[in-house]
Amino acid sequence: MQFGHRIVHGGELFSESAYINDETIAKIDSVAGLAPLHNPAAILGIKACQNAMPGVPMVAAFDTAFHQTMPKENYIYPIPYEYYEKYGIRKYGAHGTSHQFVAKRFAELVGKNIENLKIVTCHLGQGASICAVDGGKSINTSMGLSPLGGIAMVTRSGDLDPSVVTEIMEKENLTPKGVNTLLNKKSGLYGITGLNPDFREIELASYEEDKPKAKLAINIFTKTIAEFIAKYAVSLNGIDGIVFTGGIGENQINVRKSICERLEWMGLKIDIDANNVKGEEAKISTDDSKIIAYIIPTDEELAIARDTKAIVEKIK
C-alpha cells in the first residue's frame, strides 16, 4: 500500500512531488503562511494517516510544483523586490497537477512529443486558472500569490486594479480579513449577479431577458478566459492546442463555444457538433483549424497516484 496527499502550496521548496518524511513535513509547515487555510490542515491529515498506517510510504503532491518552471519575468510582481526576498511574495499558481495531466494527455491524443508542443490548458471550475505549457513545462499561469488571481471566477474576483481594494476598504471600513472574504467568497459572477453561487444556475439565467446581470457575468467570464489565452500566445510564441477541463470546461457547451468564437481571429475554428458533448474526451476544433482544441476530463487523483507509485519505487 502507498498513500498520496494533495498539498495546496509548496512555495519555492518543491518543484515536484516528494516522499514524505520529517523534513518534508517541516518544509510544508514553513510555507504554511502562503496557504494558512490549507497547509496546516494537510499536515494534520498526513500525521493522522501516519498514525493510522505506520510504515506505509506516503508522497506529497503539490498544486504549485508544476509552475516552478516559470521564468522569473512571469512570476515576479512589479513591487519593491525586497517583498519577494523577505516574504516570498510572487506568483505561484495553482491546479498544477491538473494542468500537467491534461497537457500530457493532449500530446498523446495528437500523437506528438510534448516537448514540441505549445499548449494552453484551461482548468475551469469553481476555481479556475489558465496555464501556458511550453514543451511540457509551465511558463505562465493566471493565478498568482493565491488562487484569488487571474480570471473572474464563480465567487472570486480574479485580477483587479489594487486601488479598487483600498477604495472599498476605506468606504466600507473593512479589515484585511474582511476584504479577503469579500474578494474570495462574495465577488466574481456571484458578486455581479446576486444569484446563487452555482455556475450552472448563473448560465441558465443569462438566457433570460430579465436577468441582464447574469448575461454580463457570463460575458465577462468567457471574455477574460479568451484574453488570457491570447495573452499566452505571446508567452508561448504561438499556440498548437487549447484544452478545456474542470467541471465547467468539461460540461458547459456554450461556454466553450463562446471562448473559441472569441479566438477565431487566431485561426481557431470550433466544430459545433463535436462540441455538443459533456464530460467526454473530444476534439472540438475542425480539421482545418490552425489550433487544435480538446475537451479532456482531468484526473488529479490518477496523476497523484502515478507520482506516488513512481517515487516510492525509486526509494525502494
Predicted regions and their residues:
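Phosphate/pyrophosphate-binding loops at sites that engage ATP/ADP/AMP, CoA/4′-phosphopantetheine
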Residues: 1, 106-113, 229-240
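Short beta-strand-loop/turn "lid" adjacent to the catalytic site in phosphate-handling enzymes
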Residues: 1-38, 57-59, 65-74
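Glycine-rich phosphate-binding loop of actin/hexokinase-like ATP-binding domains
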Residues: 66-171
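Oxyanion-binding "anion nests"
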Residues: 169-195
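Adenine-nucleotide phosphate-binding core of ATP-dependent small-molecule kinases
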Residues: 181, 188-192, 199-235
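Glycine-rich phosphate-binding loops at beta-strand->alpha-helix junctions
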Residues: 240-263
